[in-house]
Structures are given as structure tokens and as C-alpha cells.
């Protein structure tokens, strides 16, 4: 991924945040990724880290419609994914869908209510709706409408050791080709709680 692509996606995210009247704190930490897959138009995400404390984490995220965050799970992190604007298409599995066929129900909380979702079946969160994901629930998401902002409120986020992707090619710490200067401040990758 080129730095010019990172800058472009972050500029798009900043414009969307402004249109949606989402104010950021001074000097926020930005990250844009194609997950190391080389095609950010199909798999990509912009994250703005708002807080990452030992007890909690908050992010606001942006992606273009149908720009997927690939199937993954966490070993420790519990998180709420919140549709802040637009629409978020979610798909859930109890196990890695690349190694185990999608079968059986997935038990989750949506808007604080216990729900059963069919494994591998997509559903949509609309503005204000949230889903609570506990460690071990495999999930994939993508905006299904323009101007979608996705919130995340979670326990501490350990990007380096607590993201497990179904596709072994995914690399969230992939190299950025420096074809122009960075326009947005990035995440600190060595932060510890």
C-alpha cells in the first residue's frame, strides 16, 4: 500500500467525519490499511484511535461501501461495534469459516438483547445499533451505505497479539511505500496497558 493511498483514505474519512459532525480530539491517531492484501477498494479500513487505556478502548472507523474488514476474532478483547451513521453489514461465525463450515447459531447481544444469528448469514446494523462481540466470535463487517461511520468500544486493544484473521495472508502491519509524506498521525505500535 502506498502512503498516497493511506493519505487519500484518511482524507475521505476526515471529510465523512466532518459531514457527520463527528469532532475528533486534538492530534488523533490514524491508521489506514488494506490488510496487506493489496486492494484497499475491496478490503480496507481507516481507524481513528480515540482512547486505548488498560480498562477500555474507543475507535471511530470509516470504510467505503462494501470495503470489507476481513473475517477475524480476538482472544481477549470484548467489543461493541456501533453503527454511528450509514449502515454496517455484519457476518458472524462460531469458528473460523475457512477451516470449519458455517453451521449452527451464534449467540450475541444486539442492542443489549440476547439474539441468535445464523452462522455465516449477513445482517445489517443501522444508526445507533450495536452488537457486543465476546472473544472467540469470528466476525466480518463492511459498510452497506455511503457515509458510514463505525464505532468500537472495547476492552484494551492489543493490535499486535490479539487479532486472529481467517485468511493467513492478512497482515495489519504491512509495509507502506513512502511515495509521499504522511498527512495524518499514526498509531503507536508498541503501546502497552
Predicted regions and their residues:
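A short, N-terminal "cap"/entry segment at the start of jelly-roll beta-barrel domains
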Residues: 1-56, 105-115, 180-193
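A short beta-loop-beta micro-motif enriched in histidine and acidic residues
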Residues: 48-57, 67-79, 98-100
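Short, solvent-exposed loop/turn positions at domain surfaces
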Residues: 57, 77, 111, 119-120, ...
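His/acidic/aromatic-lined binding-pocket segments of jelly-roll/cupin-type domains
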Residues: 60-61, 72, 78-83, 122-123, ...
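Conserved metal-binding segment of the jelly-roll/cupin
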Residues: 64, 120-145
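Glycine- and acidic-residue-biased ligand/ion/polar-headgroup-sensing regions
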Residues: 65, 76-98, 104, 111
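Short beta-strand His + acidic residue motifs that chelate non-heme Fe in jelly-roll/DSBH
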Residues: 70-72, 90-91, 132-133, 139-144, ...
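Double-stranded beta-helix
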Residues: 96-116, 140-193
Amino acid at each position: 500500500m502506498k502512503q498516497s493511498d493511506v493519505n487519500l483514505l484518511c482524507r475521505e474519512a476526515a471529510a465523512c467525519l466532518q459531514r457527520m459532525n463527528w469532532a475528533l480530539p486534538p492530534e488523533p491517531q490514524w491508521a489506514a490499511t488494506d490488510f496487506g492484501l493489496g486492494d484497499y477498494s475491496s478490503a480496507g479500513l481507516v481507524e481513528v484511535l480515540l482512547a486505548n487505556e488498560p480498562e477500555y478502548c474507543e475507535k471511530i472507523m470509516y470504510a467505503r461501501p462494501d470495503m470489507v474488514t476481513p473475517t477475524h476474532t480476538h482472544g481477549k478483547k470484548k467489543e461493541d461495534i456501533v453503527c454511528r451513521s450509514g449502515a454496517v453489514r455484519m457476518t458472524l461465525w462460531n469458528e473460523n469459516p475457512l477451516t470449519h463450515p458455517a453451521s449452527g447459531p451464534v449467540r450475541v447481544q444486539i442492542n443489549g438483547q440476547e439474539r441468535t444469528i445464523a452462522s455465516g448469514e449477513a445482517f445489517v446494523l443501522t444508526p445507533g445499533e450495536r452488537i457486543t462481540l465476546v472473544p472467540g466470535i469470528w466476525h466480518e463487517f463492511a459498510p452497506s451505505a455511503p457515509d458510514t461511520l463505525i464505532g468500537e468500544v472495547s476492552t484494551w486493544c492489543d493490535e499486535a497479539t490479539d487479532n486472529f484473521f481467517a485468511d493467513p495472508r492478512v497482515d495489519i502491519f504491512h509495509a507502506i511505500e513512502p511515495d509521499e509524506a504522511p498527512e495524518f498521525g499514526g498509531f503507536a505500535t508498541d503501546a502497552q496497558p
